[in-house]
Regions:
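Residues on the lipid-exposed face of transmembrane beta-strands in outer-membrane beta-barrel proteins
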Residues: 70-76, 136-141, 188-192, 216-220, ...
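Residues that define the transmembrane beta-barrel architecture of outer-membrane proteins
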Residues: 38, 62-70, 130-135, 142, ...
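Outer-membrane beta-barrel "beta-signal"
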Residues: 360, 367, 371-374, 384-397
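Repeated loop/turn-to-beta-strand initiation elements of outer-membrane beta-barrel proteins
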Residues: 81-85, 145-148, 197-200, 224-229, ...
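Transmembrane beta-strands of outer-membrane beta-barrel pores
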Residues: 48-54, 78-80, 89-95, 143, ...
Length: 397
């Protein structure tokens, strides 16, 4: 059996610092600036986010977060192919009341679900917590119609706008708006593109406990629609599914479904199905509608207010409830500002989420934004409500 490979916290810190210094030096050397500009790309951002959380009893908790991302890319091209290497780190510092009352936060930050242990934490809940991870560390090569990659990467098989039942390797929770890059997995991927535009992709990933996911995806275009079918194994389940993306008149129309087959216990087999439609309105405004069916989700009355915010999605369980419906509306104003309003309703549980946001470009590479995640509903004829507000400043480099 393969054993998980780990790094000590000190080695990770040193490795992160070394690569940051290399990236800085490469871009700073004037005598070979053209070479480094051609083959290397360094970028990232620094964010500060203040969070306030409140409940029906009037209790309010705060949390402050400093968030840094550093991305380093190397590329070398030949006549018919090329090579690319990516190293990306995510570093966060938390402090505040919400950190002090969460005794599991430090363990959560240091937990790495990949085969390589590339995450670590430091600090104390009574003062501050630091969490660092390399969520991208991978190599990509390509030659003519072939492409291959190895390492911690994002394999995106999702085609639906909101819920991705086909995304076997990197399912994400849509309420985690502060993680735009989304998680990666330790995987090997090989892709072949055919002359008619069709493509075949095979991928396999391994987790911290040596559990594996392996599948193949075939994609093609016909009738102005993109279609795909997938088949493989998702941990202990065999899977088969597919998806589409096209349009009906002026509406975009997307969907995907996956059937998870448990050969040992048929009661644990599950179906995940999602559809969505998008429409562009006048004045650069956007309207979106989506629905999700999860056969193993909750269908009766239940208090899901807390679990919605901490829910860890998987393609087999994208939401904790059996049925979910979503409506989104967004647009721009003043040329430098944008807004969005997202509403999610969970039939049966009598709960819903309301997530408004507004973003303002203050200067080049500097944005300010305000977000809210409000969860409300009824349990035993009693109202339940949780409010979370986020103020965020982001500087990109």
């Amino acid at each position: 059996m393969l054993k998980r490979q780990g790094f000590t916290s000190k080695r990770l810190i040193v490795l992160s610092a070394v690569f940051m210094l290399i990236g800085y030096n490469l871009t700073a050397q004037s005598d070979s600036a053209s070479y480094w500009k051609k083959h290397f790309d360094v970028n990232g951002y620094v964010k500060f986010m203040q969070t306030f959380s409140g409940d029906m009893e009037g209790e309010i908790y705060d949390q402050s977060l400093w968030h840094n991302r550093f991305n380093l890319k190397f590329n070398s091209q030949t006549k018919n192919g090329g090579t690319e290497f990516y190293l990306e780190s995510r570093n966060r510092i938390f402090y505040g009341e919400a950190v002090q009352i969460n005794s599991f936060m430090k363990d959560t930050l240091s937990k790495d679900v990949g085969f390589l242990d590339l995450s670590f934490s430091a600090g104390d809940e009574r003062s501050f917590l630091f969490g660092g991870t390399f969520d991208r560390l991978w190599y990509k090569g390509y030659y003519k119609s072939w492409e291959w990659s190895l390492g911690r990467q994002r394999i995106n098989w999702g085609i639906n706008s909101y819920w991705n039942a086909n995304d076997l390797f990197n399912a994400f929770t849509f309420t985690d708006f502060d993680y735009e890059e989304r998680p990666g997995s330790d995987a090997l991927r090989i892709q072949k593109t055919f002359k008619n535009g069709a493509n075949l992709e095979v991928a396999s990933s391994i987790g911290a406990d040596s559990s594996t996911v392996g599948a193949a995806k075939l994609g093609w275009n016909i009738w102005n629609y993109d279609f795909q079918i997938i088949a493989g194994k998702y941990y202990g389940d065999y899977v088969i599914g597919g998806g589409w993306a096209g349009g009906i008149k002026d509406w975009g129309f997307k969907g995907e479904t996956t059937y998870f087959i448990d050969l040992e216990d048929s009661n644990k087999s599950a179906v995940s199905l999602s559809v969505s439609g998008e429409y562009i309105l006048k004045g650069n405004k956007f309207l979106g509608l989506g629905a999700l069916y999860t056969s193993n989700g909750l269908s009766g009355s239940a208090d899901v207010s807390a679990s919605l915010l901490a829910f860890q999605a998987s393609p087999k369980s994208l939401m904790p409830t059996r049925w979910s419906a979503m409506a989104t509306y967004g647009g721009e104003f003043g040329g430098l500002s944008s807004y969005a309003l997202v509403f999610v309703y969970l039939p049966g549980t009598k709960f819903g989420l309301l997530m408004p946001s507004i973003t303002r470009s203050v200067a080049q590479n500097f944005d300010l934004s305000f977000h809210m995640i409000n969860v409300g509903g009824s349990m035993n004829n009693e109202p339940v409500f949780l409010a979370n507000g986020f103020v965020r400043a982001k500087w990109s480099f």
